């Protein structure tokens, strides 16, 4: 099930200001390029159970159906009031949106600054709908670069330096909380072997969820595609984002005059992104007459729009929704991995069946360092005792 992509409750920064913000973010993250610095998951394949979940420690959380954003908290000089804290949301298109009426204190009582958090903006399912920003990673906190640290450490900063001070501040200042354009909280993270708890939480979540995200516990934060962030979806919900182009039928009347019939159902070609070579055709979108009528009724531009598609039981690509938060289709290798997940799916039962072994191997991995520490401590004590005996 897919929901409505939420709109960002803020004003987009103009090009000149956005460029400077990109420079500031790149400097903070020590990155040479000004592109979107967020990590992107890969589709969960059957091999990932044995090659990843059995061999490495992973956290798992629900995959929210919303708008992926980075939150950037910094300081800007106001000519009237002097330096003040400002907050931006950064989209996957690397657009910066100024978010008014928010304030983030840090754990030393001072306003937070030079901080970048990874998260998702979601809408609640029930009316009246409200916005929530769900945080799940931290790239930088109060000028401290965290991308090279393991997930455990990054989550520690996210909770101790961002989430907890904010909770206390809003508890003491409820009138400020009412002005926030969205609530802010940390996503619930579970050890991978507790995946059953995450599945059990789905019916109780206030927002739509469409899968799971597994993130490696001892892995650094990687900008771009990260092979150690695994996105799992049910087979019938695995989707691909294509760029669609339309070819309308041409009719010729008895007088030999021809015209394009823009009311008739067109042939719709689905394109994937290849990088330097741009977009190339990958397949066709199947639409029923009713679906075409519904699209026409939107009275919106349709040509060269990014569309999220799923495969039906007849292997046809079907329309799910438009993704206006994206300018490009999925990269060709991403599409191929999603196709692999569709053709050789990992079911919920497969993950639940694997959980006991994931736990067994997790415990074994984490028991080894403690055993080695005990051996070292025992050896040290023995050496110290020998020295005392000789004295």
Swiss-Prot record:
It is an enzyme of class 2 (transferase). Keywords: GTP-binding, mRNA capping, mRNA processing, Nucleotide-binding, Nucleotidyltransferase, Nucleus, Transferase. GO terms for biological process: 7-methylguanosine mRNA capping. Its main location: nucleus. Residues 363-391 are annotated as: Disordered. Its EC number is 2.7.7.50. It is found in: Nucleus. GO terms for molecular function: ATP binding; GTP binding; mRNA guanylyltransferase activity; RNA polymerase II C-terminal domain binding. InterPro entries: mRNA_cap_enzyme_adenylation (IPR001339), mRNA_cap_enzyme_alpha (IPR017075), mRNA_cap_enzyme_C (IPR013846), mRNA_Capping_Enz/RNA_Phosphat (IPR051029), NA-bd_OB-fold (IPR012340). It comes from the Eukaryota. SUPFAM superfamilies: DNA ligase/mRNA capping enzyme, catalytic domain (SSF56091), Nucleic acid-binding proteins (SSF50249). Gene3D superfamilies: DNA ligase/mRNA capping enzyme, Nucleic acid-binding proteins. GO terms for cellular component: mRNA capping enzyme complex. It catalyses: a 5'-end diphospho-ribonucleoside in mRNA + GTP + H(+) = a 5'-end (5'-triphosphoguanosine)-ribonucleoside in mRNA + diphosphate. The active site is at 63 (n6-gmp-lysine intermediate). Second step of mRNA capping. Transfer of the GMP moiety of GTP to the 5'-end of RNA via an enzyme-GMP covalent reaction intermediate. Belongs to the eukaryotic GTase family. Heterodimer. The mRNA-capping enzyme is composed of two separate chains alpha and beta, respectively a mRNA guanylyltransferase and an mRNA 5'-triphosphate monophosphatase. PANTHER family: MRNA-CAPPING ENZYME (PTHR10367:SF17). This is mRNA-capping enzyme subunit alpha. It comes from Yarrowia lipolytica (strain CLIB 122 / E 150) (Yeast).
């Amino acid at each position: 099930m897919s929901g409505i992509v939420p709109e960002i409750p803020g004003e987009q920064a103009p090009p000149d200001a956005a460029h400077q913000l990109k420079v500031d973010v790149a400097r903070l993250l020590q990155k040479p390029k000004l592109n979107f610095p967020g990590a992107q998951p890969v589709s969960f394949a059957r091999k990932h159970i044995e090659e990843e979940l059995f061999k490495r420690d992973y956290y798992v959380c629900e995959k929210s159906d919303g708008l992926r954003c980075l939150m950037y908290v910094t300081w800007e000089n106001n000519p009237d009031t002097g330096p003040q804290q400002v907050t931006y949301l950064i989209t996957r298109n690397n657009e910066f949106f100024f978010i008014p009426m928010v304030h983030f204190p840090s754990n030393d009582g001072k306003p937070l600054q030079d901080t970048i958090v990874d998260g998702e903006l979601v809408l609640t399912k029930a009316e009246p709908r409200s916005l929530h920003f769900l945080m799940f990673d931290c790239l930088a906190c109060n000028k401290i670069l965290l991308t090279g640290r393991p997930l455990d450490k990054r989550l520690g900063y996210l909770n101790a330096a961002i989430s907890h001070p904010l909770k206390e501040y809003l508890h003491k200042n409820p009138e400020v909380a009412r002005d926030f354009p969205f609530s802010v909280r940390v996503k619930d993270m579970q050890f991978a072997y507790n995946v059953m708890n995450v599945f059990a939480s789905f019916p109780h979540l206030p927002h739509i969820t469409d899968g799971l995200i597994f993130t490696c516990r001892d892995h650094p934060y990687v900008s771009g595609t990260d092979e150690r962030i695994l996105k799992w979806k049910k087979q019938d919900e695995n989707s691909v984002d294509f760029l669609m182009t339309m070819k309308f039928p041409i009719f010729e009347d008895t007088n030999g005059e021809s015209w394009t019939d823009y009311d008739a159902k067109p042939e719709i070609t689905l394109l994937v992104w290849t990088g330097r070579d741009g977009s190339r055709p990958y397949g066709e979108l199947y639409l029923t007459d009713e679906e075409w009528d519904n699209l026409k009724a939107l009275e919106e531009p349709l040509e060269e729009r990014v569309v999220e598609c799923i495969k039906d039981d007849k292997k046809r690509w079907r329309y799910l929704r438009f993704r206006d938060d994206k300018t490009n289709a999925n990269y060709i290798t991403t599409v191929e991995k999603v196709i692999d997940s569709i053709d050789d799916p990992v079911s919920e039962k497969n993950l639940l069946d694997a959980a006991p072994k994931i736990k067994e191997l997790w415990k074994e991995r984490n028991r080894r360092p403690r055993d080695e520490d005990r051996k070292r401590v025992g050896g040290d004590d023995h050496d110290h005792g020998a020295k005392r005996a000789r004295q």
